[in-house]
Amino acid sequence: MMTQMNYTGKVKRVAIIANGKYQSKRVASKLFSVFKDDPDFYLSKKNPDIVISIGGDGMLLSAFHMYEKELDKVRFVGIHTGHLGFYTDYRDFEVDKLIDNLRKDKGEQISYPILKVAITLDDGRVVKARALNEATVKRIEKTMVADVIINHVKFESFRGDGISVSTPTGSTAYNKSLGGAVLHPTIEALQLTEISSLNNRVFRTLGSSIIIPKKDKIELVPKRLGIYTISIDNKTYQLKNVTKVEYFIDDEKIHFVSSPSHTSFWERVKDAFIGETDS
């Protein structure tokens, strides 16, 4: 969905976030040298209007988590300096085009849904997180056994390696490698995908991905105490004695700078997984 922030002539605060690769540092250096003397821009990692991520999707995920509490004020734009990045609009040789587009920028943005996760521990503590791609739960040892509850109704008893819940844009990441569907981000929904479920005459699960609309809630209730591996995008945590994991579509969204260079979702999917096709 395209909307617009109010940028009537104000100086844009820009944060530049880059990974440690030589090419990324070179691009960052060029951007710094241009913006530091430009009266229309102010370089600052504090309270930025625009965050420029230089690297790939991993760097964009890191930038998202750096500013996940400021999503209502921040727009992102990505430059990829290696393999094609799903979230990035510019290649490293298109820096001048990016600078020109930012000078012409009127505050237009493309917005995508994100995931909100609430993890309840056996002592009553609740750990909350946001994910741009997906959140997964796995058991460190033995098979994971958990009830899957949708809108307070027990849907199935899961036995297997784990569960992944992804956003529409995240549907092209780990979810796709698990055999999940690719979901367009204008569909505000979550996708639940099983990780190596056990299915036999005794234990049965649906065995296919489930698309959950925004108004619905997913709950995962582990039936065994122990250590669980919780992955939120590119961050992994080990938590002991998880009693419940809840998943929602967040009220906030991630916003990307909209410009003539913004690549449509299906173009990104084609470029990432199919490449050039015969005419």
Curated annotation (Swiss-Prot):
Pfam families: NAD_kinase (PF01513), NAD_kinase_C (PF20143)
InterPro entries referenced in this protein's UniProt entry, alphabetically: ATP-NAD_kinase_N (IPR017438), ATP-NAD_kinase_PpnK-typ_C (IPR017437), NAD/diacylglycerol_kinase_sf (IPR016064), NADK (IPR002504)
Catalytic reactions of this protein: NAD(+) + ATP = ADP + NADP(+) + H(+)
MF GO annotations: ATP binding; metal ion binding; NAD binding; NAD+ kinase activity
Keywords in alphabetical order: ATP-binding, Cytoplasm, Kinase, NAD, NADP, Nucleotide-binding, Transferase
Keyword NAD part of the UniProt annotation: yes
GO BP: NAD metabolic process; NADP biosynthetic process
This enzyme's EC code(s): 2.7.1.23
Any one Gene Ontology cellular component term annotated for this protein: cytoplasm
Cofactor(s) the protein needs: a divalent metal cation
Subcellular location field: Cytoplasm
Signal sequence, start to end: none
Active site: 57 (proton acceptor)
Residues that, per the record, bind NAD(+): 57-58, 133-134, 159, 161, 172-177
Keyword Kinase on entry: yes
Gene3D superfamilies: Probable inorganic polyphosphate/atp-NAD kinase, domain 1 (3.40.50.10330), Probable inorganic polyphosphate/atp-NAD kinase, domain 2 (2.60.200.30)
NCBIfam families in UniProt: PRK04885.1
PANTHER family tied to this protein: NAD KINASE (PTHR20275:SF0)
Role of this protein: Involved in the regulation of the intracellular balance of NAD and NADP, and is a key enzyme in the biosynthesis of NADP. Catalyzes specifically the phosphorylation on 2'-hydroxyl of the adenosine moiety of NAD to yield NADP.
Family: Belongs to the NAD kinase family.
Name this protein carries in UniProt: NAD kinase
Species of origin: Streptococcus pyogenes serotype M12 (strain MGAS2096)
